[in-house]
């Protein structure tokens, strides 16, 4: 692979929205400057991939054909002359590459840079044997964690950590806070476990329509589970009628935000992570009079990724991984779209 301009790579290409991804050989450029070429060890499948595949979440700069996949980890095989990493290291790839010039990038908030590059959305991602990373600054080194275990941390883990950091001021208002996690899927795997790892005095209530997913929430560490229709009586019982300190909404529809708002204590908040709906809804009187909040939470910081990697390496976060060969990626998309996945599917080239 030394001194070549292109590297052949088998990859899953999105050529037409909502049609099966095409498995083809593509050319990946040799890294230059700060760039790094990694051999993908694992690439997680996220609901965002589904939305991009369906054509409902196209970022500025999106072009077809494209290799999807923004939850990526692997091994460094080639580096540009300015890259500050070395070959052979296992790494996980941060998934929003800021332009490094805006006021938010100067604060390290690359996740809200309007000119961000996102692998799998505005540049080729990791559903491939090899992936070119724009700069070594977007890599977090793995010590004991395998790339397959680390891949979902690039988004699901980092997004969960980012949401929890936003929730901390509200959780700390109460001596025995009750935290709602709404929507038990790939994100909840990490949200529930991180909450348990960081805070010992909280009570977690997992909400899902599916009994299977409610049982899964208990396995992850939730203290109680409920359907939304029964949640009010449970929350009132747990808090003597006060309400929950925080609700982390991993679904994000008008119905979920409205119902969760009614479950909050005064000065409680919803951290909105999911984007399954087009709008959110809260009761104006209830929200204004009781000082309730709705906060958006998009992804997380490089430090969030670093922290969730170290929590995983210390054994405080257990991976729930379903390995899927690259050739079966379309089956993985179907399974996720039809709600048949507990944990995180990880594509292995």
From Swiss-Prot:
Comment on pH dependence: Optimum pH is 8.2. Is more than 50% active in a relatively narrow pH range from 7.3 to 9.3.
Disulfide cysteine pairs (residue numbers): none
SUPFAM superfamilies per record: GroES-like, NAD(P)-binding Rossmann-fold domains
Keywords recorded for this protein, A-Z: Arabinose catabolism, Carbohydrate metabolism, Metal-binding, NADP, Oxidoreductase, Zinc
Catalysed reaction, written as an equation: D-arabinose + NADP(+) = D-arabinono-1,4-lactone + NADPH + H(+)
Temperature dependence: Optimum temperature is 91 degrees Celsius.
PROSITE patterns listed in its UniProt record: ADH_ZINC (PS00059)
GO biological process per UniProt: arabinose catabolic process; protein tetramerization
UniProt binding sites for Zn(2+) 1: 46, 70, 155
Enzyme Commission code(s) on record: 1.1.1.427
Cofactor annotation comment: Binds 2 Zn(2+) ions per subunit.
GO molecular function ontology, one term from the record: adenyl nucleotide binding
Cofactor(s) needed: Zn(2+)
Domain comment quoted from the record: Contains two domains: a catalytic domain (residues 1-154 and 292-344) and a nucleotide binding domain (residues 155-291). The active site resides in a deep cleft between the domains.
Subunit note: Homotetramer. Dimer of dimers.
Function: Participates in a pentose oxidation pathway that converts D-arabinose to 2-oxoglutarate. Catalyzes the NADP-dependent conversion of D-arabinose to D-arabinono-1,4-lactone. In vitro, can also use L-fucose, L-galactose and D-ribose. Shows highest activity with L-fucose, in combinaison with NAD, and lower activity toward L-galactose and D-ribose. When acting on its physiological substrate, D-arabinose, shows a clear preference for NADP over NAD.
Family, per entry: Belongs to the zinc-containing alcohol dehydrogenase family.
Protein's name in the database: D-arabinose 1-dehydrogenase (NADP(+))
